[in-house]
Amino acid sequence: MNYLVTGCSRGVGLEICRVLLEQGHTVYGIARGFSNEFQQLQEENQEHLFFKSIDLSDSENVRKSIFKDFISNKLRLDGLVNNAAMAYDDIITNLNLEKLKAMYAVNVFTPMMITKYAIRNMLLHHTQGSIVHISSISAHTGYKGLAMYASSKGALEAFSKDTAREWGELGIRSNVVVPGFMETSMSSTLTDEQKDRIYKRTSLKQPTCIRSVAETVSFILSDKAGSITGQNIHVDSGTI
């Protein structure tokens, strides 16, 4: 199977690539930067892991930068993981429109455009493909300072549900995996006290395991999840 994964170079995106490679799939990864961890993974999987550096804030050039210069119509795409994201954290009264637009470009507009062309590829090859969007528990549980970021993930979740309804008749599935708080570069600026407050809101009193999220994504991409579409699957250490 051939899978496209955005935000592949670190964190949960890197782990998703690792899990898919372990299962014998071929992964086409895109991200702004190229991490040492991804480089090592690519060296270990030279024939099955490919990378292209792309500015994911440039939503208008998705077709050329990804689906012409990287993944052509000759390649059958079996699945897509929209994982790339950026955070814009602040309280609502400090909202900056330019920063909000920049975040929405990466978190909403580009994933929507990538989905558009991924579905076109699936239609061309008569593929019953699977699309997985990575959201955030912040879209479901209120956190101070995360209103803007949470709203972008909420938009992505609504888009996924309608995508599922629109294309399900042709066997194309769309789902969302909703991770809880994970120890990633996006959370590195939080203090231990802030992290402890987040942990206390979970049933397991611990961060969400990145590997668990990646394994869930792999399952949703697979035929084993063939009857699952239009859903939000929470992997969040029981944040209730």
Feature-to-residue mapping (PLM):
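Alpha-helical segment proximal to the catalytic Tyr-Lys
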Residues: 120, 124, 165-169, 226
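Active-site helix of classical SDR
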Residues: 115, 152, 160
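Conserved NAD(P)H cofactor-binding loop of Rossmann-fold oxidoreductase domains
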Residues: 83-88, 238
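Conserved mid-core segment of classical short-chain dehydrogenase/reductases
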Residues: 87-101, 145-148, 186-191
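Conserved glycine-rich cofactor-binding loop
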Residues: 9-10
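Residue(s) in the substrate-gating loop at a strand-loop-helix junction
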Residues: 136
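C-terminal substrate-recognition "lid" of short-chain dehydrogenase/reductases
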Residues: 206-235
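Catalytic Tyr-X3-Lys loop
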Residues: 86, 93-113, 132, 156
